[in-house]
């Protein structure tokens, strides 16, 4: 946000220095990024007077100028289109550095003629992009003086950084209001001359979606002259980098920068029929007769329409975009940009002047999707003060009446109402002291809040506080405390010695455990990622039921307006982005928070894999990731935590998170506590993110994972048998509902002196087996530590195993 000192003084009686103002702005939370003083930067450029000119003997487009300076008459060669005798100009003497290009002026010979300086344009001094000619100064400018005082540049420019929640200071008036509350100057009262309307507008207004457009106002103005705006207005806008175009455009820019309320002007002679505001973007003229237009709404397969904007670009709008239409088509993208069809030009004599409030989320979503950045969008998506909208329309109307000639003005046409008064919050002295350490009397608190525009009502130790209409970010007691502190002064808060910290062993152990989890996954080829804890509510509703309390009040963007219910959407989004860049093989994880409600935040370790385990090469065809890869990674993490994954798997649960495949995922529990899930991601999720390959993931709730006390002691020595190992294959027929993992775990523990490993190599179910049965085939490695196993030993083992499987699982050996 840029503004000049003189612009600030239009609304604030102030005698403070530029430095004092800059410090005060930073103190109240409006960080000053820069103070630009053009007068100092351009102090070496002086006023000069062209006494006489004559043609250059060797160049038709160049002139030889006799220029009067404080050091006498100089000859300067100039090719500007507006160079002529008897005008005051800006001179750069020899040795001065020109801002554009950073080159120094030297005595030079141009086409055989000497030149002892340079006559400057705005572009060369980086004042604007206008290179049509040299700067012309007023006749009263004194030769030899610094030119800036005659060109309105002796006006320091403040550049402040505005946070997304402070839409109220996107106008100079709002900044003046804050400085006045700080005690730096007195806010001037806005005096508005009475506007005498001379007719009623016949243009009808229909607002189809009051939630999308809570207030829309306009006036019709006739017989105006859209001439260049006065010099004071042009200079204000130029100083903050706004190109001046015409009175109408300059006035709307002035209102937006002064009060934060975007204003739009339509050429009334290009508007046909009624105006309507809504999200039905498709319309087409089907007949035209005596200026009466009939329209038909076209519903194409994707409900889209083309919109030609004032910036010369064409945009494809959808039914989600809020538009302003007449009966001939779209005339504007609400809150963002006007259409080319009804734009004003020098010949415009009749206009419709609009001031409105639009839904901030809709404006932000459309602007982001269409990649349109305008000052109007910037302000609308940060919320407009609906109670000031009609007053802004009046101020703009008065400016048009004073600048654009003897105009006729209609009554205001309005749909919608001002914002209702907000619900009061009960604020106490004790609450302020509790969270800030500041002790103020209830009277002092009331004075500060009143200066900021808050309505207060003291009831004993409680102040009932109602936030002003322009402060959309004041919703809780902490917001009020922040307002008090920033005006009272952060520098007045006494510093205190912090208490000595006592290390919490549990926190330290938890930190070390999480670090170990990360190392385990990293050793398996997983990469760690860190993503934002906020996400789009559109994405979030695919993973959990949306809760109103998890919506952010002031999101940075519409894509980050919801507190994530799970980390998975962020990781799946990364997969989608990588696939778009032809990266197909991925394995990564994140440790981060998920939010159940405002009071419950859980820390999850979430991992995800997709693509191939290893790349194809001459020695391997590669292998795609499957559910066992993600299970293996989870198993190692769980085992490090002192648990067994097999004991945590719940096989018969059918209720899974909606984003998992219904038959290829499983819950993991420790008793009644849900620890997480693992499995394949649901195809509908993949389709939403435009992913054409399988994804497997696990989610481990670290918050619910017990912190088992670490056991230290002497490790058992690894013993390797010197005797031959034997391998036996078995196929057992068991019931379909028996878990294969449970059977394998049982065999592993069946005879620990002999069984070294058990590997599953086949599962079969089909016509060759009885109904409700399946066959599992396993390979068992048998090895004794003290002898070579004989055939008798092996047969005895087989007989015992078959009998045990029969008793435990009602299984039979397949012939």
Swiss-Prot record:
GO terms for biological process: phenylalanyl-tRNA aminoacylation. It catalyses: tRNA(Phe) + L-phenylalanine + ATP = L-phenylalanyl-tRNA(Phe) + AMP + diphosphate + H(+). Residues 721-814 form the FDX-ACB domain. Binds 2 magnesium ions per tetramer. SMART domains: B3_4, B5, FDX-ACB. Its cofactor is Mg(2+). Its EC number is 6.1.1.20. Tetramer of two alpha and two beta subunits. This is Phenylalanine--tRNA ligase beta subunit.
């Amino acid at each position: 946000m840029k503004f000049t000192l003189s612009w600030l003084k239009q609304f604030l009686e102030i005698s403070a220095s530029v430095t004092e103002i800059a410090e005060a702005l930073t103190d109240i939370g409006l960080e000053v990024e820069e103070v630009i003083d053009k007068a100092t930067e351009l102090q070496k450029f002086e006023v000069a007077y062209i006494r006489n000119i004559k043609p250059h003997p060797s160049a038709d487009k160049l002139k030889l100028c006799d220029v009067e300076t404080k050091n006498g008459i100089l000859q300067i060669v100039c090719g500007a289109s507006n160079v002529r005798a008897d005008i005051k100009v800006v001179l750069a003497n020899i040795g001065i550095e020109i801002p554009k290009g950073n080159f120094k002026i030297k005595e030079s010979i141009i086409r055989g003629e000497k030149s002892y300086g340079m006559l400057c344009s705005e572009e060369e001094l980086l004042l604007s992009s206008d290179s049509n000619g040299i700067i012309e100064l007023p006749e009263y400018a004194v030769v030899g003086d610094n030119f800036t005082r005659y060109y309105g540049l002796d006006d320091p420019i403040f550049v402040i950084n505005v946070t997304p929640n402070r839409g109220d200071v996107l106008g100079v008036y709002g900044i003046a209001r804050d400085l006045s509350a700080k005690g730096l100057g007195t806010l001037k009262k806005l005096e508005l001359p009475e506007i005498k309307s001379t007719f009623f507008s016949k243009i009808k207004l229909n607002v189809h979606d009051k939630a999308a457009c809570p207030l829309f106002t306009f006036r019709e103005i006739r017989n105006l002259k859209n001439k260049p705006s006065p010099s004071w207005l042009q200079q204000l806008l130029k100083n903050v980098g706004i190109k001046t175009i015409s009175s109408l455009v300059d006035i709307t820019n002035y209102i937006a920068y002064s009060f934060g309320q975007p204003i739009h002007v339509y050429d009334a002679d290009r508007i046909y029929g009624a105006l309507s505001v809504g999200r039905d973007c498709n319309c087409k003229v089907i007949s035209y007769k005596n200026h009466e237009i009939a329209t038909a709404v076209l519903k194409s397969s994707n409900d889209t329409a083309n919109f030609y904007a004032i910036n010369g670009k064409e945009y494809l709008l959808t039914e989600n975009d809020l538009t302003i239409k007449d009966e001939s088509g779209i005339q504007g993208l609400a809150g963002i940009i006007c259409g080319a069809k009804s734009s004003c030009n020098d010949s415009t004599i009749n206009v419709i002047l609009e001031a409105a409030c639009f839904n901030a989320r809709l404006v932000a979503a459309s602007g982001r999707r269409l990649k349109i950045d305008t000052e109007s969008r910037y302000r609308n998506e940060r919320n407009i003060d609906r109670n000031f909208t009609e007053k802004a329309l009046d101020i703009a109307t008065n400016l048009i009446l004073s600048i654009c000639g003897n105009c006729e003005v209609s009554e205001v046409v309005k749909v919608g109402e001002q914002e209702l008064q907000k619900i009061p919050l009960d604020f106490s002295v004790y609450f302020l002291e509790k969270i800030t350490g500041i002790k103020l009397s209830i009277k002092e608190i009331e004075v500060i809040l009143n200066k900021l525009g808050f309505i207060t009502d003291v009831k004993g130790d409680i102040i009932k506080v109602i936030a002003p209409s322009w402060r959309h970010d004041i919703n809780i007691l902490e917001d009020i405390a922040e307002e008090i502190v920033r005006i009272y002064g952060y520098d007045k808060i006494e510093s205190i010695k912090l208490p000595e910290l006592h290390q919490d062993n549990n926190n330290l152990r938890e930190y070390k455990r999480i670090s170990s989890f990360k190392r385990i996954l990293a050793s398996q080829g997983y990469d760690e990622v860190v993503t934002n804890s906020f996400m789009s509510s559109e994405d979030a509703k695919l993973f959990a039921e949306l809760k109103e309390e998890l919506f952010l009040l002031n999101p940075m963007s519409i894509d980050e307006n919801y507190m994530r219910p799970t980390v998975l959407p962020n990781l799946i989004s990364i997969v989608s982005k990588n696939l778009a860049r032809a990266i197909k093989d991925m394995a990564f994880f994140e440790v981060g928070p998920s939010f159940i409600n405002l009071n419950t935040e859980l820390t999850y370790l979430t991992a995800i894999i997709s693509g191939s385990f290893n790349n194809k090469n001459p020695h391997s065809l590669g292998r795609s990731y499957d559910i066992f890869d993600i299970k293996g990674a989870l198993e190692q993490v769980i085992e490090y935590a002192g648990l067994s994954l097999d004991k945590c798997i719940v096989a018969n649960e059918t209720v899974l998170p909606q984003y998992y495949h219904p038959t290829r995922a499983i819950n993991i529990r420790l008793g009644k506590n849900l620890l997480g899930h693992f499995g394949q991601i649901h195809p509908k999720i993949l389709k939403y993110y435009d992913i054409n390959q399988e994804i497997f993931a696990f989610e481990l709730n670290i918050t619910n994972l017990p912190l088992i006390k670490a056991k230290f002691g002497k490790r058992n020595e690894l013993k390797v048998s010197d005797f031959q190992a034997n391998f036996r294959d078995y196929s057992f027929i068991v019931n379909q509902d028996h878990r294969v993992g449970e059977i394998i775990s049982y065999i592993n523990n069946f005879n620990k002196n002999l069984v070294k490993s058990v590997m599953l190599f086949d599962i079969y179910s089909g016509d060759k087996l009885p109904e409700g049965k399946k066959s599992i085939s396993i390979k068992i490695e048998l090895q004794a530590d003290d002898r070579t196993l004989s055939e008798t030993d092996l047969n005895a083992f087989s007989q015992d195993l078959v009998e045990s499987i029969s008793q435990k699982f009602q299984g039979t050996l397949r012939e």
